[in-house]
């Protein structure tokens, strides 16, 4: 090595790149030819011949005569000319992936009072150190050398008690030193500047509440909310605004003496809260988190294993965020509400700066055939979950959140970017848990550089029977196109969406293996709220008519086969004042307006009534398509009205027969009912109740415009 350095300035060789496990591509300066024959590779262990296998314009492909030494700095030698070998394209080969796959479960930090062990997967690094700091803001650390194993894992053992010591890794990759955060870090400093060696026992709760069994995913009612939105408002009675612990506060009320916060969630009767991202994300300065203009949904993850610091009472404390998220989850469990995490594994925030790219350049992110960054996510990078160690990282993270934080489910953002094998491995891992874990995701078919037949998109749903998918076709059929703001749907005057409505209310059996795969919704954090969408379509319509359309849309979701999903505030016509994408808008756009909730308490109670009916009656949440085909009978299908009969329910339900009518017209509909039985109304245009609202005295029912009615009989019960 040393004798070659002085000739490096010759610059006849422009670059040397390791393409595969046995091939180096040399690029020559334009003034040079490829006539030279005497090619070698050299490192501190000696030098070995290279064989020319292909010559092209200013490039030569060279075949190695022995396995490449990944633990050495290598140079290509030709006569008096030399060039360092850059380990680059090879990391995206199957051979590299298989050779360096590490199946162990000790990546990151393993702490005891007697010894701390650290491990980082850095297969192309030739040197790795760990730097220890007494304070998170220290600039100079104490350096310890790590040793490498055959799978590219670098380790160090630190004798003594290193609890609450901060650390970074220092890796030497492609002739460059880089200081990086541990990708498997479990505790972080403010803004994730350093990782902390922590004792998990210091964040454990004395006892976790016991959850009552949930017999089936079909029993779920999901309620999606953002930590800051839900707690930041001035009129909610919550003290710890914008923080995890704000959602643990009981007994909070608004100025109208109506309950708020976690008590409100319990009163609604939902079974699951889906939290928008709580993994550490990069767009918020955690030291300035109370600024009302300093807001983000959090879909810009930087660390897979650590909670977001801006929601902690003290983001400078490495333990605070972990302890307080656990307290939040336990508080919801106490109310018998399960927790779904919205996880972002499809991309990373500023990929160039991520520790994954710094440690193993080119491995963790998907590339096109032209070696450009794949960008199906639309944010500059796609995570290459199909690679062994990327997939392992996702599965490890899921396992960690279940075991350490008692999470009950995961919503995979842009799941269609990820591959089906990864999602199968995730589902398999969740089966190891001591409780049922629910997985759902966005199965959008996005333009990433990976074959669609191998990705977790809706068209592959039958390959993933344990995973649920957002049913966007039903969504758009109900309210109109999400991406064309003025295009109407069933509830707003579209005569051509009835087929999607019929499919959706039956559980979307054309798409899925079972009803539990269908996530039915009309509103989520993305895009316009339902209210704002309806205002776009009908800008001059009376408020009362808009409210009827809104209630109709929500009632369709709540009564359909599959799993209903509500966006927080949907039950009281939540608005974001026309903002179509509020991901970084100020609090006044995104926050929960509890005054509006109070004003529309009657509608809140209407949705609560639908929730009670659904939870009390299995006929609305049948387990199989076989059962749906047996009991579901279409009575009427018109462009603006659908009526169906859930019949012969027998032992399935306390009600013998149920008739559901969704009238999207501006006129009253007269719907015939089966004769020779007593029919009772439990849902009309004003109320939804387990106790009948009225008895129907004839063989038909007059259904009000823009409303849902449910009629039942229970003659044998």
Describe these PLM feature segments.
Residues 191-202, 427-573, 577-583, 625, ...:
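Conserved alpha/beta catalytic core and glycan-binding cleft of carbohydrate-active enzymes
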Residues 120, 169, 225, 275, ...:
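Conserved, mostly hydrophobic/aromatic
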Residues 122, 163-167, 693-717:
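C-terminal beta-strand-rich structural cap/linker in extracellular carbohydrate-active enzymes
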Residues 228-405, 415-418, 423-434, 438:
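Substrate-binding/active-site clefts of carbohydrate-active enzymes
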